Amino acid sequence: MGLNLTSKQEIVAEIADVASKAYSLVAAEYHGLTVAHLTQLHARARENGVYLRVVKNTLARRALADTEFKAAEEKLVGPLVLAFSMEYPGAAARLWRDFFKENDKISTDIVKFVSISGEVLAGSEFERVAKLPTKEEGISMLMSCMLAPVAKLARTLDAVRQSKEAA
């Protein structure tokens, strides 16, 4: 049974709202995935701050029209599951990467495209996006870069003090 107009409008509004808040989008074909696979993906998505939804492509196109994922509209072909990263840019790509590691019989070719910062990347690029650091990892990397010169200065001053004491 098809969706009525009100249901379609609600779906478009929901997807548009999610897309306006999302950092990235990963679209993959769900053809060939079992119900158990999709259930596993949905559970992991909730844990990792990823909004996962199977939606008709025409509704997805309308929802993405006024978002930064507008460039992905023409790539919405075939049976797709959309994964929006809600907490950091690489969350959806990591979800798929971890899923493929656990289910090695499923080909990574089912990822059709990745959209991030208004650009659409090929599906094969999802590994690169998955390697993006989380917010905490990024802050940690920045802090280590900022602390390294201070630590080096402290070691240098300590070495000068020790050489004066030895003399």
UniProtKB/Swiss-Prot annotation:
* CDD domains the record matches: Ribosomal_L10
Taxonomy, superkingdom: Bacteria
One cellular component term (GO) for this entry is: ribosome
Which region is the signal sequence? none
Has the keyword Cell division been applied to this entry? Answer: no
What keywords were assigned to this record?
Ribonucleoprotein, Ribosomal protein, RNA-binding, rRNA-binding
A single GO molecular function term of this UniProt record: large ribosomal subunit rRNA binding
> GO biological process: any one?
translation
Entries under Pfam families matching the protein: Ribosomal_L10 (PF00466)
Outline what the protein does. Forms part of the ribosomal stalk, playing a central role in the interaction of the ribosome with GTP-bound translation factors.
Tell me the subunit arrangement. Answer: Part of the ribosomal stalk of the 50S ribosomal subunit. The N-terminus interacts with L11 and the large rRNA to form the base of the stalk. The C-terminus forms an elongated spine to which L12 dimers bind in a sequential fashion forming a multimeric L10(L12)X complex.
What protein family does this chain belong to?
Belongs to the universal ribosomal protein uL10 family.
PANTHER family with a match to the protein in the record: 39S RIBOSOMAL PROTEIN L10, MITOCHONDRIAL
Q: Please identify the protein, giving its name as recorded.
A: Large ribosomal subunit protein uL10
In the UniProt record, the gene name given for this protein reads rplJ
